[in-house]
Design a protein with these regions (language model features):
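C-terminal helical/coil "lid" or tail adjacent to the Rossmann-like core of SAM-dependent
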Residues: 123-173
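Short alpha-helix
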Residues: 97-119
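A short glycine-rich, Lys/Arg-flanked "PGG" loop and its adjoining helix->strand segment in the class I
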Residues: 54-69
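A short SAM/SAH-binding and catalytic strip from SAM-dependent methyltransferases
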Residues: 39-52
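A short acidic, Gly/Pro-enriched loop at the edge of an enzyme's catalytic core
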Residues: 29-41
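Core SAM-dependent methyltransferase catalytic element
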Residues: 112, 134-139, 174-184
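Short, glycine-/aromatic-enriched active-site segment of Class I SAM-dependent methyltransferases
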Residues: 75-96, 109
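Class I SAM-dependent methyltransferase SAM/SAH-binding core
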Residues: 1-30
Length: 184
């Protein structure tokens, strides 16, 4: 968003790096840069919000130079699989269009022309990360979270319940994270 670009510019200015970094507002499925512009495309736990993950990866391939790498982590459906109702519950709460699987990401990367170097399932530790999120929400960021949601304690309780559900799904291997690195 324009707001995020402005924030990023402030941060790069503060670090004295504004001359080395150029930013453009764009769409990950239509990246506003020419072919072979980058040596790295990177993402962190955000591609779960993208509807057309195939197009995202194809665009990454397009803007990468030969030998360039794509590296990302993302929230995924775990190897134990989610039922339709479990997937719907997590996707609705998190506002995901859907979650890919690790094997699904491998296929998307290969179909786009990438050679996979790393495909790690990080699900085993994911439940502990969610536990930490819950602890932070209930012990450290309670005031800030309540402020964001208009001090609605009922909604705050519902949010906590959804996070506990996600933790349960992660402990069962149904919901997790992956790390992927591939080369063009």
């Amino acid at each position: 968003t324009a707001r995020m670009i402005n924030e990023a510019r402030k941060r790069t200015d503060a670090e004295g790096m504004s001359r080395q970094i150029q930013m453009k507002l764009g769409d990950v499925t239509s990246i506003p840069w020419p072919e072979k512009s980058f040596d790295l495309v990177w993402g962190e736990d955000a591609w779960c919000y993208v509807v057309d993950k195939e197009k995202l990866v194809q665009e990454a391939y397009r803007v990468l130079e030969e030998g360039g790498k794509i590296a990302f982590t993302d929230w995924i459906e775990g190897s134990s699989g989610l039922s339709d109702s479990e997937a719907s519950r997590i996707n609705t709460f998190m506002k995901f269009p859907y979650m890919e699987t690790r094997k699904g990401y491998e296929k998307i990367l290969k179909d786009a022309g990438f050679k996979i170097e790393v495909s790690d399932d990080l699900t085993a530790d994911f439940a502990d990360h969610i536990s930490l999120y819950i602890k932070m929400l209930t012990e450290q960021f309670t005031f800030d979270a309540l402020k964001i949601i208009g001090n609605d304690m009922e909604l705050f309780g519902q949010m906590g319940g959804e996070m506990v559900f996600m933790e349960e799904m992660a402990r069962k291997g149904k919901f997790g994270r992956c790390r992927m690195i591939a080369v063009k």
